[in-house]
UniProtKB/Swiss-Prot annotation:
Lipidation (S-diacylglycerol cysteine): 16
Similarity field: To B.suis ORF12 in VirB region.
Native organism taxonomy: Bacteria, Pseudomonadati, Pseudomonadota, Gammaproteobacteria, Lysobacterales
UniProt name for this protein: Putative conjugal transfer lipoprotein XF_a0011.1
Primary location: membrane
């Protein structure tokens, strides 16, 4: 009981020291460098796009 305050203080300080720093602020225009391009197979056909999104579901379940 005598050392409770000291132990709690040490745990709090160690927890704050182990936390990661804040990421840097974005200045200017944000451009992601590792962007994954979308597959062109779906194209502009809404039926193909719908099937690509729904996977194995039939059309009534998806809509």
């Amino acid at each position: 009981m005598r050392y409770t305050f000291g132990i709690v203080t040490v745990y709090l300080l160690a927890g704050c020291a182990g936390s990661p720093p804040k990421p840097p602020e974005v200045k200017g225009k944000y451009r992601p460098i590792n962007r994954v391009e979308a597959p062109a197979s779906a194209g502009r056909n809404p039926v193909n796009s719908l099937n690509a999104l729904c996977g194995n579901l039939n059309e009534k379940q998806c809509r």
